[in-house]
A protein has these predicted regions:
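Non-heme Fe(II)/2-oxoglutarate
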Residues: 1-87
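Short, conserved beta-strand element in jelly-roll/cupin
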Residues: 97-100, 114-133
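Conserved hydrophobic/aromatic beta-strand scaffold that supports enzyme active sites
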Residues: 7-9, 95-97, 125, 155-157
């Protein structure tokens, strides 16, 4: 594993037209909605996530995402050095829907697995939004850092153990 980067990004990975097509496909074909107990909780056992999350299997969405899997493996190999498994067709992809009317947000958390047989090394995010206000993506690795590069269309990879949050959408 490389310690050089906390995150890696590619701006304009998807165009506005592609983002709209992908979002609409997920909204119309999602297989489930994330359960409340699957998200990070605070010390009072309340959800830190105030957003709706649609789930879709990788096998159902991968053709719409072009070379995403190859890109992720390549960027990982050159910037992080994790040994990643190929994407599984039954693995769930998440679409977090942040609503400005509800001031949607996701408080400080890190990504992890509750499994005894696999773990999570790398988190991959694609910003499928159109322009918006608020909803800043931040990481904390010794100090808080707003990832200004995470704009609509950006592909972002980061080490899953790094604390991160999404500020309220306004």
């Amino acid at each position: 594993m490389s310690w050089q980067y906390d995150y890696w990004y590619v701006e304009n990975y998807y165009s506005a037209k592609e983002r709209k097509k992908i979002s609409e496909y997920i909204e119309n074909n999602h297989t489930d909605i994330e359960k409340p107990d699957a998200v990070a909780m605070d010390k009072n056992n309340a959800s830190k996530k105030k957003a709706n999350t649609l789930l879709i299997e990788w096998g159902k969405i991968k053709n719409m995402l072009g070379n995403l899997e190859s890109s992720v493996h390549s960027y990982n190999q050159h910037n992080f050095g994790y040994l990643l498994s190929p994407f599984n067709n039954l693995s769930k992809c998440l679409l977090n829907v942040y609503d400005s009317k509800k001031k949607s947000e996701y408080g400080w958390h890190y990504d992890a697995s509750r499994s005894d047989i696999y773990d999570v090394k790398l988190t991959v995010l694609v910003n499928l939004s159109d322009k918006y206000t608020g909803g800043k993506f931040c990481i904390f690795n010794g100090e808080e850092h707003v990832v200004e590069e995470f704009k609509p269309g950006t592909l972002l990879l980061f080490k899953s153990y790094i604390n991160h949050k999404v500020t309220p959408r306004s």
